[in-house]
Curated annotation (Swiss-Prot):
Positions that bind heme b b562: 84, 183
Residue intervals passing through the bilayer: 34-54, 78-99, 114-134, 179-199, 227-247, 289-309, 321-341, 348-368
GO MF: metal ion binding; ubiquinol-cytochrome-c reductase activity
PANTHER family for this protein: CYTOCHROME B (PTHR19271:SF16)
Family statement: Belongs to the cytochrome b family.
Superkingdom of the source species: Eukaryota
The organism's taxonomic lineage, starting at the top: Eukaryota, Metazoa, Chordata, Craniata, Vertebrata
Names of required cofactors: heme b
Localization, UniProt: Mitochondrion inner membrane
Binding locations of heme b b566: 98, 197
Co-factor: note: Binds 2 heme b groups non-covalently.
Name by which UniProt lists this protein: Cytochrome b
Length: 380
């Protein structure tokens, strides 16, 4: 019998083992859809971004006009622009849900997969940040100024580092040029790290909602999960297209429709919604270096999660106390996101500080404690 080319060809064999004949647990739920959705988001962002880059000019005098020109005069330029801007929001929605799934079901015990995932999150955040600067509106300019300035809090080398990043003594043309270069490069880095992420995942195989070994019951990825992923894709594309076509500027800041002006500071400088939780943590500490450290810790804390797992069970499926704590953490993150969008005044300052404290307390202290308590209650 002639060998199946899908299984013998050097390149097709890899694709086959990753996407077609991949042995997959038979009971993974829709929460396992987000990996493929993130891949689709990345491809969409790279394609729309590439087409937008063809019409963009990375120069302070022309950037704002070139974006307006793309939206007005390029065929479907408005659609590319809005898909790219809102696609970023959906990228973050998917990655937050993907991380939440990993936390809930103990997927972080696959340490290499988890750590590459954290690197992917950081790279995505960097990409989104430099991308937000490109239209060179007011919020682009002041966001870039405020966030890059945080590096000056690093002792001894801080100021030098900031001026090196800016390419001068303030955010100006060199800054915009290098941010465009970085925004073009980073998504391809994300694609590369994604392949490493998948490589590590396929070493161990997927986790499942029960958190137990699924070796006894595996099914091929195609057609079962390929069709399930396509369903997930259509469910995601519906709100993305609805947002893009009906209310494209809903998640943006009106301030960014004003060209950048170094002489006028906007009343409230705030990042896009997906950074607000970290921004709230940054603002809640009345010290520059302390705030920067808390900001870094708010994301890097994910690297500690595997070491804080004290339960004898992997997933939270059968652990009601940990489940309660998990949803408290979700509520806490929503509060942080809301507080980050509010001005720095009386009720919001204290709410932000309490929510920031709760965030670190839940992750660093309460999760391990409750895990150990549940072991004791179950005599494990």
């Amino acid at each position: 019998m002639a060998p199946n080319i899908r299984k013998s060809h050097p390149l097709l064999k890899t694709i086959n083992n990753s996407l077609i004949d991949l042995p997959t647990p038979s009971n993974i739920s829709a929460w396992w859809n987000f990996g493929s959705l993130l891949a689709v988001c990345l491809i969409t962002q790279i394609l729309t971004g590439l087409l937008l880059a063809m019409h963009y000019t990375a120069d302070t005098t022309l950037a704002f006009s070139s974006v307006a020109y793309t939206c007005r005069n390029v065929q479907y330029g408005w659609l590319l622009h809005n898909l790219h801007a809102n696609g970023a929001s959906f990228f973050f929605i998917c990655i937050f849900l993907h991380i939440g799934r990993g936390l809930y079901y103990g997927s972080y015990l696959y340490k290499e997969t988890w750590n590459t995932g954290v690197v992917l999150l950081l790279t995505l955040m960097a990409t989104a940040f430099v991308g937000y600067v490109l239209p060179w509106g007011q919020m682009s300019f002041w966001g870039a100024t405020v966030i890059t300035n945080l590096f000056s809090a690093i002792p001894y080398i801080g100021q030098t580092l900031v001026e090196w990043a800016w390419g001068g003594f303030s955010v100006d043309n060199p800054t915009l040029t290098r941010f465009f270069a970085l925004h073009f490069l980073l998504p391809f880095m994300i694609a590369g790290i994604t392949i490493i992420h998948l490589m590590f995942l396929h070493e161990s195989g997927s986790n499942n909602p029960l958190g137990i070994s699924s070796n006894a019951d595996k099914i091929p990825f195609h057609p079962y999960y390929s069709i399930k992923d396509i369903l997930g894709l259509t469910i995601m594309l519906t709100p993305l297209l609805t947002l893009t076509l009906f209310s494209p500027n809903l998640l943006g800041d009106p301030e960014n429709f004003t060209p950048a002006n170094p002489l006028v500071t906007p009343p409230h400088i705030k990042p896009e919604w997906y950074f607000l939780f970290a921004y709230a943590i940054l603002r809640s500490i009345p010290n520059k270096l302390g705030g920067v450290l808390a900001l870094a810790a708010s994301v890097l804390i994910l690297l500690l999660i595997p070491f804080l797992h004290k339960s004898k069970q992997r997933a939270m499926t059968f652990r009601p106390l940990s489940q309660t704590l998990f949803w408290l953490l979700v509520a806490n993150l929503l509060i942080l996101t809301w507080v980050g969008s509010q001005p720095v005044e009386h009720p919001f300052i204290i709410i932000g500080q309490m929510a920031s404290l709760s965030y670190f307390t839940i992750l660093l202290i309460l999760f391990p404690l409750i895990g150990a308590l549940e072991n004791k209650m179950l005599n494990l």
